[in-house]
Structure formats: C-alpha cells, structure tokens
Amino acid sequence: MMKKLLLFVMITGIISTAHAQIENPVTWTYTAKKIKGDVYELHMTAALEGKWHIYSQDAGDGPVPTSFEFAKNPLVKPDGKVTEVGKLDKEYDPNFKSTLRFYTGKVDFVQRIKLKSPVNTLVKGKITYMVCNDKKCLPPRDVDFSIKINPKS
C-alpha cells in the first residue's frame, strides 16, 4: 500500500512539474497584409491569457524586452523598425525598481517590408519575449515564425 501511495505522489509531482515547465500564456499569430504595390506589413500578434502581460520593445530596466530577429531573405527589404499597436501600459515596478512598459490582452507587432521581386517567399525569424503577471514572471522564451508572402493573390 505504501509503495502505491509513494508511486502516486511521485507521478503527480512529475506531472505537476512538467505542466509548470510548459506554461505558455501567449498565443502568437502571423499574417502578411499587402499595403500597395510591393509594400507589405507583417503582423506578429500576441494574444495573452488573463492578467499576463508582455513587455514592449522598450520595456524599461529589468525585464527582457520583446525583440525580433529576421532571417536574411534576398527578396525582402525591411522598411523601418517594428512598431507596436495596442494599449501600452506604464507602471512602476518595485521589483525591477523601474517604470515598465507592457501590453495586456493583445498587441500587434508590425514590420513593413518591400518585396524586391514579385515572387512567393517566406519571411522567417525569431521573437524573444518575456511575460509576467501579478504573481510571477516566466523565463524569456524564443519563438520561431514563418510568414508567407504571395504577391499574386
């Protein structure tokens, strides 16, 4: 009987640990929108669960800001920097001893690009971000993305 109880406790602990390690309150979606001619907007949208928030690219001192790294693509030229569309919150955080900038609910990160040739291509890259709620922060996370550009459609 004790062996079964011990086994049950161990399995429950392993499952709880595994669940905690894969906690991910962010869902990312990726789309391309043709603006005009050879100009497109890449939309990398973060939807956050509950009271979780994601930090701005200019987060403040302390947390890891959201950042974007685009893979080289000879068919694509970036046009400016990634912009943020959403309700930006600013709040002093005594843990970081800094005023932090973040988004709750949803934020759309937008990168304009120019297509050098009217052919289908993929824009690939990596997003690094960190999320927190009022109780804890999760470690920074990297997410790879791939966005289809189809100028003929």
Regions found by a protein language model. Give the residues of each.
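Sec-dependent N-terminal signal peptides
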Residues: 4-14
